[in-house]
Amino acid sequence: MIDVAAYVGSYPFRHLPHPDPDVLVRVLEREGLAGAWVGYLPSVWQRDPAPGNTALFAALEPYPTLRPAPIVRPDWPRWEHTLEEALDRGAAAIRAYPMHWGMGPYDPSMRELALACGAVGVPLLLTTRFEDLRQRSPLDVASDLTAAHVRALARADASVRLVVTGAGREMLEETHWGLTPAEQGRVHWDFAWIWGPPEDHLAHLFRTVGAERFVYGTHWPLRLTQNPRANLDLLPAELRDASITDASTLAFRR
């Protein structure tokens, strides 16, 4: 099983102990995970993602189980070249942050990025949020990703594959039930921000949306890696054998 939501690097708004790739490797081994799609956390709040992408590839090079998931900003000059270079260097997925870039749900450049990723068979990874609004720094002014953003990209083309991390039940349902069955199949979700008992939101979504719509994500080092494992362990007995999707199967590019 692959972790789709892991990061290395510092966080601008609070101290994170040991956000380093060698520590992440040990964390994944402890959790029984085969690897991770890894982003470079500081790049989210930087206008130009190129220096962060360079740092990401360099940091992960000694660790074959850590697959880079760099940022491609589609309103930036020569973004197509950035995408091609990232794929040539082994990117497992491409990250984009439309809320941090001030892009609306129907921004044409985001659609172009989704189409470009779909054409080469690489998932486009979107992050709903990094922290709850109650603890978010006032300097972090980006809003949460909206259901409208996800629906617009899912409708762009049949080749598009989206992985959405950090969503709660409300956002997931608003997105999922606003799509056709074919469009629903283009979107996968992690469940690190979805409640287990006593609310049992995850169990409800396994029953209604389907366990196959979910992938595994920890959000390390921002969140405890044990959270998603605990959510699975605390599912009702009739759902404990339900199989989520291994994210490594989502890309047809090799």
Features from the language model and the residues they span:
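Histidine-centered divalent metal-coordination motifs
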Residues: A5-Y11, T127, G166
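Acidic-and-aromatic substrate-binding clefts and catalytic sites of carbohydrate-active enzymes
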Residues: P12-P19, S43-A50, V72-E80, W101-P108, ...
